[in-house]
């Protein structure tokens, strides 16, 4: 009898090990979320940094971490960007249960959009009206680059930066193009 109990226990242990979650993207999201909640923004950026796979959630976590570090214009494009400007925000899909939501990002930006307001219009408005925090400018300029709106980007930069200011790396590169 004890041998059969031991065999059942061993079988359950093997089942747990073999049948455990092997979704690498999900594990990256959980790890990044953990570091984000702990305020360890550099560690968020190291999660899955060598992988070419990046979920929208992980991409949004990286954007939040870069924004908190003030490095969005210098390092955003060092990571895969598969979702255009949508990757700066979390999915609003109710199937995804996240501790971080777009409300977290709106708090970071210092404003929230009106119901149904286009994100690009929202970001532009809070930058030009001055209702957002300083982080909103990086979100706006990065969104323009992610949407490949180089003309709008080139028009916006002089509105927010003085000629003698040192621009972040990717902003300088975009202006050269």
What are these regions (language model features)?
Residues 167-168:
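Substrate-recognition/cap regions that form aromatic- and gly/pro-loop-enriched pockets
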Residues 2-23:
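Internal/C-terminal transmembrane anchor helices
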Residues 18-157:
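Soluble catalytic regions of membrane-associated enzymes that act on cell-envelope
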Residues 172-173, 177:
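Long, compositionally biased charged/polar accessory segments in the mid-to-C-terminal portions
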Residues 158-163:
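Active/binding-pocket-proximal capping segment
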């Amino acid at each position: 009898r004890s041998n059969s109990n031991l065999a059942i226990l061993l079988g359950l242990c093997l089942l747990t090990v073999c049948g455990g979650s092997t979704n690498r993207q999900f594990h990256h999201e959980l790890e990044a979320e953990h570091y984000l909640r702990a305020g360890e923004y550099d560690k968020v950026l190291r999660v899955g940094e060598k992988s070419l796979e990046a979920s929208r959630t992980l991409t949004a976590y990286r954007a939040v971490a870069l924004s908190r570090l003030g490095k969005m214009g210098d390092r955003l494009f060092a990571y895969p960007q598969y979702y255009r400007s949508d990757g700066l925000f979390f999915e609003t899909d109710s199937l995804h249960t996240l501790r971080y939501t777009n409300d977290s990002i709106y708090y970071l930006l210092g404003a929230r959009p009106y119901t149904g307001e286009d994100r690009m219009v929202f970001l532009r408005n809070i930058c030009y009206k001055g209702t957002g925090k300083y982080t909103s400018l990086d979100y706006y300029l990065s969104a323009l680059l992610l949407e490949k709106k180089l003309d709008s980007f080139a028009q916006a930069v002089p509105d927010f930066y003085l000629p003698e200011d040192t621009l972040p790396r990717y902003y300088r590169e975009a202006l050269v193009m």
